[in-house]
Amino acid sequence: SRRQRQMCIRDSFYGGKVKYMVNDLLMNLHGLAPLCIPINKTGKQAKDFPRMVEAGFASDNQLIMFPAGLCSRRQNGVIRDLDWKKTFIVKSVEAHRDVVPIHFEGRNSNFFYNLANLCKILGIKFNIAMLYLADEMLKNRHKTFTITIGKPIPWQTFDKSKSPAGWAQYVKDIVYKL
């Protein structure tokens, strides 16, 4: 079955110990729950965000995260990530964990990108587009995506020669060249 193939693919990498740090709204897709570490960045539980990230890095799971903290956005007709946050650099050094650059080539619907842009124009701070993430995932069922995995970057690379934000940009540049 499709689910068995997905689990087989996941289990072939790092013995199945791969987790995605995702917005907790995606936990409503029950098939994703075992693969994810839910992150709540809004509301009353937002104060737990640092603890949730810390727990993910302290685990023995390999973590896949989205360093921009949001899905890519379409700006001037180009779909790109927003600025990457430095969290993954700081935590990689603290936890002595290497960073493996991964480029996932995919896209959301025009509705999603237009909604995100409309909210930005209207000055709406709440990320309304995230409410549609589960729907966007379902729209992409049965589609093929290209995932390119780069060479691991040792955590020791992230020294004081650049700021954590500078290193985040460095890794972003590597990912976009994959």
Predicted feature locations:
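A generic secondary-structure signal marking the coil-to-beta-strand transition
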Residues: 5, 17, 35, 143-145, ...
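A broad structural signal for alpha-helix termini and local helix breaks/kinks
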Residues: 13-14, 95
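A generic structural signal for short
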Residues: 9, 41, 76-77
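Non-catalytic C-terminal accessory region of glycerolipid acyltransferases
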Residues: 47-178
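Short His-Asn-centered micro-motif
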Residues: 3, 21-24, 66-68
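Membrane-interfacial amphipathic helices and adjacent loop/beta segments
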Residues: 14-51
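Short, small-residue-biased leader/transition segments that mark boundaries at the very start
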Residues: 2-9
